[in-house]
Amino acid sequence: MFNIPPVVIATVAVLVLVHALRMLVLSDAEDLRFLLTFAFIPARYDTDLVLGGSFPGGLGADLWTFFTYAFLHADLLHIGLNLAWLLPFGTALARRFGAWRYVAFMLVVAAAGAFAHLVSHPGAMVPMIGASAAISGAMAAALRFVFQRGGPLGFWRLDSPGDSYRVPAAPLLATLRDPRFLIFLGVWMGLNALFGLGSTSMVGDGQEIAWQAHIGGFVAGLLLFTAFDPVVPRRELDTRPNG
């Protein structure tokens, strides 16, 4: 049975409630102010722009929008696609990390996605929203262990579902050389390029996909996985004395 951890259910609930608030409760003017307060807007950080100081939220928003943009979505399709990616990869990560590490990790990779967008779109006025930079980070982290022997997608999966999510992870270089990782990455990138699945949107005409944020979240997930992972790496297990 596909048992979703409570922290992932809570994540889904928060995303849905925020979207419902914007769509059903706030007026158009209120929603615009809400968007300008909590979406990620690179122009906030451009001191050469006259409008840079006119965004609502002030200095606080300069910090919190690195995280809060991930809770906003453009429409039902946008949030639905992101939830479809979040459920499997968020579940894998939460089962391995536990609730608090999962939350901290998701916030960090969301911020990494925002930073990548800031670097690639300096001074841009178009707000960026969507959870997929964080989900990209969760996907990258999950790919460090799901294909390992005894893991949920590996050979000889362990009988206990909980244990299968806590097998020792592959080293980073081994992950990057794993054909299964490369195939999965290629399919995911292709789907995003063709259909914008799980996209982080730059709000505006056409809702351009902020693919740099996806890459930022993904790379951060790969690199920071070890810092959050509570499972002892295999190489450390192999060097421990017996008895």
How does the language model describe each region?
Residues 1-243:
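A detector for small-residue-rich transmembrane helices and their helix-helix packing motifs
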